[in-house]
Amino acid sequence: MQATRSIGIVVTAGAVALATAGVVPAGDGKEQIKFNPADQAAARAVVIRRADLGSSGWTGGPTKPDLSSGPRCANYHPKVSDLVLTGAARTTFQNAGFAFDSQSSVLKTKRMVALDWRRSVLAPGAVTCLRHTIGKGLGSNAKVVSFRKLSFPQLATYAALFRGVISVSSQGTTVRVLTDLVLVGRSRTELTLTIVGPVSAKSALSAAERRLARSLIARARA
């Protein structure tokens, strides 16, 4: 899915926000973009809303979807030029060291989603390329400790979890930040959730991302 299409990494005050969009990386160029009103509305229905986060203190909201090309590595360059993107939406929220980013993509056909998943998420080079790209984007005060693909509940036709642990040093203190990339897809809809927070909150973050993935993909109209 546009699982790794765009990865932007920001390190601030010991928190790492890794923003992704959709569920497919770059490969042989870009997918074709042919937005239509119905699929744009369907994409907006799937992303995180403030009410989905429950507690107060969250700031953020809708932002421009990232449609740029994703990482390219020698052993990882999935074909995307035959995919047609008909809808996209994105929201980002932050709260005291936590960052939640969601981006949805609607493709023209179900078959395109299946191709997208097989080429990018299931590709043997995905983990290695993602880790390399993340590490390259971090500043000198941060480094990737680990990055791997983990099991995730089959909440939809397609579901996967990539988890990174990043060490961040600031003012003589080093903290470890968890960065989870959750990818789910159903019918023509793809959703990427990026959840960032302290490693000490791993259990709470895992529960939150499963709850969100389940409720958001249930809102898919396309």
Label each residue range with its predicted role.
Residues F100-S104, D180-L181, R186-G197:
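Short, well-ordered beta-strand elements
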Residues V84-L122:
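A short acidic-to-branched-hydrophobic micro-motif
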Residues G60-S68, P124-D180, A218, A222:
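Short Gly/Thr-rich strand-loop-strand
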Residues L193-A222:
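Surface-exposed amphipathic alpha-helical segments
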Residues G27-A89, H132-T133, L138-G139:
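N-terminal "mature-domain start" segment
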Residues M1-G27:
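Secretory targeting and sorting signals
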Residues K34-D39, A99-K108, V196-S203:
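Second-shell loop/turn segments in exported
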Residues L107-M112, K149-A159, G185-T189:
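A short, structured loop/turn motif at beta-sheet edges
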